[in-house]
């Protein structure tokens, strides 16, 4: 019993899938997503402080004017308060904007990736190409990924999230995702990895990721792309480097 309790206390269950009525982010698995979470929490703190201050000022003004409206009848403007409510919000916006721009540029940087994976959006499935690897036939390792239909789902699989084949990647490796589309605009989005990039026909967009823990991460197309839009899930399995090489040899 004590061993079971100790296991429960020392085991962290990560939230890497959408959950009903969720009001917060999924657990981060990359430095980019960790930065997004930290920025969100910091901004929310400032917003709550501002909300409390504005609510207190509004309540105070309403109560003051209600008790003695005649005394303030001929006050038309106040230069001091006008200067304050102009400068103070500008300072707050600068405080918020500065770290936002830093994070934005950091997320866009792709520095010396160890491998490149190309994700191509189709109506309504994904195709993945491991451009750095060639199989025994001399061809690039590539495969297509389709959603598992409801009637073929097995116990434990997630509806509209599980796919017949998964993208397999190694952890602690700088990965560059090159994203495009073959027909209409799609969007390659995996919340836990902090990835959301448009897949545009005729254009190559790129984003990097450094996955720091093993696990299965789910995403989906986040751009309305037709009647089968809901049937474009993304499933990424992050494994250790030896397991990744073993999987690669099987392709």
From Swiss-Prot:
A molecular function (GO) term:
copper ion binding
Q: How is the cofactor bound?
A: Binds a dinuclear copper A center per subunit.
* Modifications the protein undergoes after translation, according to the UniProt entry: The N-terminal sequence of COX2 is processed by IMP1.
Query: One Gene Ontology cellular component annotation?
Result: respiratory chain complex IV
- What Pfam families is this protein classified in? COX2, COX2_TM
Q: Which residues form the signal peptide?
A: none
| Chain sites annotated for binding Cu cation A2 | 221, 223, 225, 229
Q: What spans does the record annotate as topological domain Mitochondrial matrix, numbered to this chain?
A: 65-78
Q: Enumerate the residues binding Mg(2+).
A: 223
Recorded catalytic activity of this chain's protein: 4 Fe(II)-[cytochrome c] + O2 + 8 H(+)(in) = 4 Fe(III)-[cytochrome c] + 2 H2O + 4 H(+)(out)
Q: Which cofactor does it need?
A: Cu cation
Give one GO biological process term.
Answer: mitochondrial electron transport, cytochrome c to oxygen
Propeptide residue span(s): 1-15
**CDD domains hit by this protein:** CcO_II_C
The site annotation (Cleavage) covers 15-16
The segments annotated as topological domain Mitochondrial intermembrane are 16-30, 109-251
Could you list the residue ranges that cross the membrane? 31-64, 79-108
- Family recorded in the similarity comment: Belongs to the cytochrome c oxidase subunit 2 family.
Summary of subunit composition and partner proteins: Component of the cytochrome c oxidase (complex IV, CIV), a multisubunit enzyme composed of 12 subunits. The complex is composed of a catalytic core of 3 subunits COX1, COX2 and COX3, encoded in the mitochondrial DNA, and 9 supernumerary subunits COX4, COX5A (or COX5B), COX6, COX7, COX8, COX9, COX12, COX13 and COX26, which are encoded in the nuclear genome.
What role does this protein play?
Answer: Component of the cytochrome c oxidase, the last enzyme in the mitochondrial electron transport chain which drives oxidative phosphorylation. The respiratory chain contains 3 multisubunit complexes succinate dehydrogenase (complex II, CII), ubiquinol-cytochrome c oxidoreductase (cytochrome b-c1 complex, complex III, CIII) and cytochrome c oxidase (complex IV, CIV), that cooperate to transfer electrons derived from NADH and succinate to molecular oxygen, creating an electrochemical gradient over the inner membrane that drives transmembrane transport and the ATP synthase.
Stated name of the protein: Cytochrome c oxidase subunit 2
Which species? Saccharomyces cerevisiae (strain ATCC 204508 / S288c) (Baker's yeast)
Please state the gene responsible for encoding this protein: COX2
């Amino acid at each position: 019993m004590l061993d079971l309790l100790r296991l429960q206390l020392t085991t962290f269950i990560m939230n890497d899938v959408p959950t009903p009525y969720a009001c917060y982010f999924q657990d981060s698995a990359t430095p980019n997503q960790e930065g997004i979470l930290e920025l969100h929490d910091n901004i929310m703190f400032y917003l709550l402080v501002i909300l409390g201050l504005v609510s207190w000022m509004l309540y105070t003004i309403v109560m003051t004017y209600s008790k003695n409206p005649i005394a303030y009848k001929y006050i038309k403007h106040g230069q001091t308060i006008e200067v304050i409510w102009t400068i103070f919000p500008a300072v707050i916006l600068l405080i918020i904007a500065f770290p936002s721009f830093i994070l934005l540029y950091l997320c866009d940087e792709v520095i010396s990736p160890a491998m490149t994976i190309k994700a191509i959006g189709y109506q309504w499935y994904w195709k993945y190409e491991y451009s750095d690897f060639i199989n025994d036939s001399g061809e690039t390792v590539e495969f297509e990924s389709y959603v598992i239909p409801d009637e073929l789902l097995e116990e434990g699989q997630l509806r509209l999230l599980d796919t017949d084949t998964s993208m397999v990647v190694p952890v602690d490796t700088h990965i560059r995702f090159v994203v495009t589309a073959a027909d209409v605009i799609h969007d390659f989005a995996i919340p836990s990895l902090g990835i959301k990039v448009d897949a545009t026909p005729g254009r190559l967009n790129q984003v990097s990721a450094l996955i720091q823990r093993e696990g299965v991460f789910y995403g989906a197309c986040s751009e309305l792309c037709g009647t089968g839009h809901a049937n474009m899930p993304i499933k990424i399995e992050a494994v250790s480097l030896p397991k990744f090489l073993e999987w690669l040899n099987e392709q």
